[in-house]
Amino acid sequence: MSNMFTIKKMRDDQTINFAADELKKYLWTMMPKSGNTPISLEPGATDGFRLGLLEDFGLENEATDATWDDVVHIDTTTQGGILAGSNPRSVLFAVYRFLKLNGCRFLFPGFDGEYIPRKVVTGQKYHKMADLRLRGHTTEGDPSLEQALQYIDYQTKQEM
């Protein structure tokens, strides 16, 4: 059962590229038999998991300022669908929200804080604009570089 999924990016953007890599990594962790999921740049694609901005799919963007306001849109089946956002950061948030809706948990920073179930992904529908434009935490003390990077990764998975 190899290449069960495909990931298609609607545009070439550093953050969307990272979102595609993260989706590929976690799909493989959840379903090792799904094989090596190919990632490609295919604007206008209509199959596979499609990552892009809301406008790439003709979806309305209710954000006042798309650069600062995060809108996440998910409309998937078991074989793929749309993971979109108001900006590239929101596309990454859409990937993490999709994974959480499928049972993944990011409990605390670092690999040990992740719970990734072994299961087939299910279709999801979700659309939300963030309640607050600015979200996050602060760190106190003197974290190491490794701790700081793990914290940044964790906060992104919490859509902050």
Which sequence ranges carry the predicted segments?
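Cell-envelope and extracellular/periplasmic
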Residues: 1-12
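Flexible, charged surface loops at secondary-structure boundaries
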Residues: 1-2, 42-46, 75-77, 130-131
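Feature activates predominantly on carbohydrate-active enzymes
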Residues: 10-22, 26, 65-160
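N-terminal segment of the mature soluble domain
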Residues: 21-40
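Short, well-ordered secondary-structure micro-motifs within conserved domains or adaptor modules
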Residues: 36-65
